[in-house]
Amino acid sequence: MKAAILATAAALTGSALADVAHMRRGHDSFHHRRAMHAQEPEETCGCTTEVITFYGSPTLVPISTPSATPTPAPAPETTSTEEVTTTLHSTSTSTVTVTATPETPEVTLPTPGVTSFSSTGVYTIPATTLTVTDTTTVCGATSTELPSGTATYGGVTTVVETSTTVVCPYATVKPSGSTVTSVIETTTYVCPSAGTYTVVPPTTTYVPTSTVMVYPTPATFTPGTYTQDAQTVTVTRTDYTYVCPTFHPELPSSSAPAPTTSAVPTTTAVPTSTVVPSSTTSVPASSSSSSAEVPQTTGSGQMGMTYSPYTNAGGCKSKADVLQDIATIKQKGFTHVRVYSTDCSSLEWIGEGAKQQGLIMILGVYIDSSGVSGAQSQVTDIANWAEWDLVSLIVVGNEAIQNGYCTASELASFITSAKQAFKAAGYSGQVTTTEPINVWESSGSALCSSIDILGANIHPFFNSEVTASQAGKFVQSQVDILEKICPGKDVINLETGWPSKGSANGLAIPGTSQQSEAIKSLRNDVGALSVFFSFSNDLWKSPGAFDVEQYWGCIDQF
């Protein structure tokens, strides 16, 4: 099992966007695998024109003969009579206007809003809150950026372990007069044996230039109050289409409190189509279309903590120990827990603890040296588990490109396939991967279309010119760079921290007091968008670069 979790340390290259001194170095061994029914839609009302045609019997209309001009009297036997018959149709037209009053007021559901920007600039979309009283499935919307040429989008793929009949709802468009209407249909697909099947084929299209394609997807909403966070959108090209992230339900009062300086602004209005230009440069809020709350992406706080259920010897912790650890994470004020893979009963035990404590999970699909094919079973495990109310984000791969386990194109394809499997199992939240900044700079063009939010691991210690007190500012500078790589997509820092023991890396000095100083800086500057690494020291790892790999445990700093 150890062989599956060890990785070769790789040095990060410089960046055209960031100073070489601000690049993360030699940090790959962190990431080893041990390591809304709504009220029924009202009927369409309008004006109806009724045309009634009456048909009568033919009527004979005699034609008067003009007075005769005096002429010599004709012989009697030559007298003749002429009769002319004309048939008329009588038509009567009546117009009846019917005005219907809906029995119930219109219900607005928290489906994603689609906004088009005709010019470049920075725009702010205000926050909105809606209440849903009944469960319903409607057409939502999602988007993907297509490269120029022939491309595919949409579709549903499922993974089965035995002969199975799959009944799958899917969204499509149908002609309606001179326009098209999004509708939900259901297909039944027979999977004859274990394997991966395309239940709903993707759509193939041709675009002359890079285009953001918006298309319908099924969305089910259960009763509750849904909030859509304010969005700051940086538009870098004209005629840009932006799909607002789906609303997320508010957590019950028993859940852990959100960071005090990043409360979600709300209104009682229906989502507005007005977009207000803004000069703000703050990081846009991240959101999720799943039923779990997603963290704010600006300001101070302590959003998440990474957790690996391993003992110091590298074995699996007991269920009791796992539940106690998850309780501690909640007691320390965190709202999210990040899990790297599905081994050691992570889904079941950590999931149970998260449910008990009101925590939200960031799930992981770990890719090791076996490549993307070796990670397929984890996708199946997560799809079968399907406790989506606990999940806000699924991270497919953890520095897999950095470690040389797959190429960017292989990872992008695997993410797309995994997203389809999760969606077929009922998941409507976000999916991403995570890599250091240099990989995003070199491979962002291949990855951006497959992810919903940009995930990065940002560790200031591996920059030799960053002191512990500068950790937060350094991470924010890296986030600023990452925001430009996948325009319109938020950034989440999925790993950050500081070691408590080891050798110095220039100005970056490990130690207990330095860790405390760094954690304080990170909490103040980027805590609300960051997952702290890690819950406890990982003594089962090898020492690694600067002998620090075992000493990142930081739960006691909170």
From Swiss-Prot:
UniProt feature, compositional bias: Low complexity: 76-105, 252-292
Q: What residue range is the signal peptide?
A: 1-18
Point to the regions of Polar residues compositional bias: 293-305
Name the domain of life: Eukaryota
* Any one GO biological process: cellulose catabolic process
Q: Which reaction does it catalyse?
A: Hydrolysis of terminal, non-reducing beta-D-glucosyl residues with release of beta-D-glucose
Q: Which Gene3D superfamilies match?
A: Glycosidases
Q: Where in the cell is it found?
A: Secreted, Cell wall
Region of interest called Disordered, as start-end residue ranges on this chain: 64-105, 251-305
Functional note: Beta-glucosidases are one of a number of cellulolytic enzymes involved in the degradation of cellulosic biomass. Catalyzes the last step releasing glucose from the inhibitory cellobiose.
Q: What is this protein called?
A: Probable beta-glucosidase btgE
Organism this protein belongs to: Aspergillus terreus (strain NIH 2624 / FGSC A1156)
